[in-house]
Amino acid sequence: MTERTLVLIKPDAVARGYVGEILSRIERKGLTIAALELRVASEEVAGSHYAEHAERPFYPSLLEFITSGPLVAAVLEGPRAIAAFRQLAGGTDPVDKALPGTIRGDFGLEAQQNLVHGSDSVESAEREIALWFPALSSI
């Protein structure tokens, strides 16, 4: 069964020149890029995307970071796309949790600026795709 997921290549990865490497890893994994856009996230979109963290102490710095510069938003498709990308990304904390060979394990330096975001469930993917790519929404 084909699944869709939202991936964000965050501003730190764009600034450090890792977009090509990350997209290459996605393609080598066998996932299809169904949509891709370079953009600067608005505070409104960023706030909606990270709404579940609104009461957390790191929320203001998270919004500041994700809106700080260009990012790449993409919709990936493929069998078990959500789990496949999350495996490719590695653990959220690049130093303590991400294994070598993963995007975060190879290039990440700290937990908040951890290069990429990938949806964590089918429900999250549907919500996030609707937010970032309304024309592709199935909601």
UniProtKB/Swiss-Prot annotation:
Its EC number is 2.7.4.6. It comes from the Bacteria. InterPro entries: NDK-like_dom, NDK-like_dom_sf, Nucleoside_diP_kinase, Nucleoside_diP_kinase_AS. SUPFAM superfamilies: Nucleoside diphosphate kinase, NDK. It catalyses: a 2'-deoxyribonucleoside 5'-diphosphate + ATP = a 2'-deoxyribonucleoside 5'-triphosphate + ADP; a ribonucleoside 5'-diphosphate + ATP = a ribonucleoside 5'-triphosphate + ADP. ATP binds at K10, F58, R86, T92, R104, N114. One of its GO terms (biological process) is CTP biosynthetic process. CDD domains: NDPk_I. Homotetramer. This is Nucleoside diphosphate kinase.
